């Protein structure tokens, strides 16, 4: 990476991390703290308050992605962070569950993922884009694991309202990073050069990746519905769960960093892509078998989590990179908007379906369903054509062709 690429990658990863930290801190404590609000004893209303964020995200990813194509990435990112901060303040003040739900909806309306990812693609070359996306993925995954450790003592100190106020502060800090640290974005293309939304949505290669990220995050959210109970069955108290997640994430990133970029440079990205899906399927199958044991060994669960995160982190880095390569510069905001829309819908469906499967079929039934869904994804992905090469690979192929002619 060049110095400007490193600066852009680090700054945009920091924006993602600041925003996601505010969200992830809520996950382990929201349902427990919501009971203190009027109506908080109704699981459906609590679930709506938690999940409506994903719904408004899904509705606005494409419009805001297209807006970033038209009016500029940084302008849309700033507006989205401001809206996220306003929603956080509404939720911090909320005297009732209805106001809390409104605050969460406003948070979700600040749907900047497509614009941030498109800006990262604009500021990096093909050859290093997967590495840049991986840096964003690392920041999000580490933020998630860290939040599971620090959220319980933090909410005990400041309450749920205090957590929402903290998310507003983090959003404002993100706005400062956009204004002062992120490099200037490249000039926008004229309106006539921009592709239509229909062109992006009908691209079968992008559709495969969009379907893939939907399945990936549906499986991930369903996993978190059942995994804490499985760790309790293994004899690990809830206060220590976050450390298992953190260690698994760190170890998985070490493996991904050692293998992914090296294999991508050698032209094996398709094999890595399919292998990562296979690892997730293997992890889900192992979790199904572990659940059937009644009291699974903790070491086995840790190993399966490690395998899951290798696959998950690899796909989180490679899929948006591929979307940005397949879409032209004039399409990136719209294409990544579609991608992030399906990602948000995956969150929503995974949480709802995971809860329903757990209620109907138990933990082992949930993981069996996740295994089947992942195997279906592997089957669909197997028919993908050769994935686009990065710039060095294309140059190498051109040189080889020249040598052959001479």
Locations of the language-model features?
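C-terminal membrane-cytosol helix-exit motif in multi-pass small-molecule transporters
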Residues: 168-187, 380-385
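Cytoplasmic helix-loop-helix junction between adjacent transmembrane helices
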Residues: 103-140
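Juxtamembrane intracellular "pre-TM" segments in multi-pass secondary transporters
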Residues: 1-6, 182-212
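Intracellular juxtamembrane helix-capping segments at the cytosolic ends
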Residues: 112-124, 314-327
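Cytoplasmic membrane-interface "Motif A"-like loop-to-helix N-cap segments
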Residues: 70-80, 265-278
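C-terminal transmembrane helical hairpin of 12-TM major facilitator-type secondary transporters
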Residues: 270-319
């Amino acid at each position: 990476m060049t110095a400007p690429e490193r600066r852009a990658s680090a700054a945009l990863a920091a924006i993602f991390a600041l925003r996601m930290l505010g969200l992830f801190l809520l996950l382990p404590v929201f349902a427990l703290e919501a009971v203190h609000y009027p109506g908080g004893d109704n699981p459906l209303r609590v679930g709506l308050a938690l999940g409506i964020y994903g719904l408004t995200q899904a509705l606005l990813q494409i419009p805001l992605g297209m807006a970033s194509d038209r009016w500029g990435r940084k302008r849309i990112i700033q507006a989205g962070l401001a809206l996220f901060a306003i929603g956080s303040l509404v939720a911090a003040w909320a005297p009732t569950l209805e106001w809390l739900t409104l605050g969460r909806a406003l948070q979700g309306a600040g749907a900047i993922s497509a614009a941030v990812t498109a800006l990262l693609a604009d500021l990096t070359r093909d050859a290093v884009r997967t590495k840049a996306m991986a840096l964003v993925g690392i920041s999000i995954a580490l933020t998630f694991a860290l939040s599971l450790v620090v959220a319980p003592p933090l909410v005990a100190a400041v309450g749920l309202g205090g957590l929402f106020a903290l998310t507003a502060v983090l959003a404002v800090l993100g706005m400062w990073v956009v204004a002062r640290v992120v490099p200037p974005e490249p000039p926008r293309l004229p309106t006539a050069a921009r592709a239509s939304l229909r062109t992006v949505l009908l691209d079968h290669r992008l559709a495969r990746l969009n379907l893939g990220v939907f399945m990936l995050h549906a499986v991930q959210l369903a996993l978190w519905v059942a995994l804490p109970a499985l760790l309790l069955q293994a004899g690990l108290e809830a206060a220590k769960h976050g450390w298992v997640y953190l260690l698994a994430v760190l170890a998985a990133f070490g493996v991904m960093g050692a293998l992914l970029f090296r294999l991508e440079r050698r032209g094996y990205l398709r094999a890595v892509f399919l292998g990562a899906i296979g690892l997730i399927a293997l992890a889900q199958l192992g979790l199904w078998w572990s659940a059937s044991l009644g009291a699974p060994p903790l070491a086995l669960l840790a190993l399966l989590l490690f395998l899951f995160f290798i696959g998950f982190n690899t796909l989180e880095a490679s899929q948006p990179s591929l979307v940005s390569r397949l879409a032209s510069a004039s399409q990136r905001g719209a294409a990544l908007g579609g991608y992030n829309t399906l990602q948000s819908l995956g969150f929503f469906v995974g949480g709802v379906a995971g809860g329903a499967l757990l209620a109907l079929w138990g933990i082992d039934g949930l993981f069996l369903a996740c295994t089947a869904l992942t195997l279906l994804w592997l089957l669909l992905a197997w028919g993908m054509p050769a994935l686009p090469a990065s710039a060095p690979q294309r140059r190498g192929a051109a040189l080889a062709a020249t040598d052959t002619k001479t």
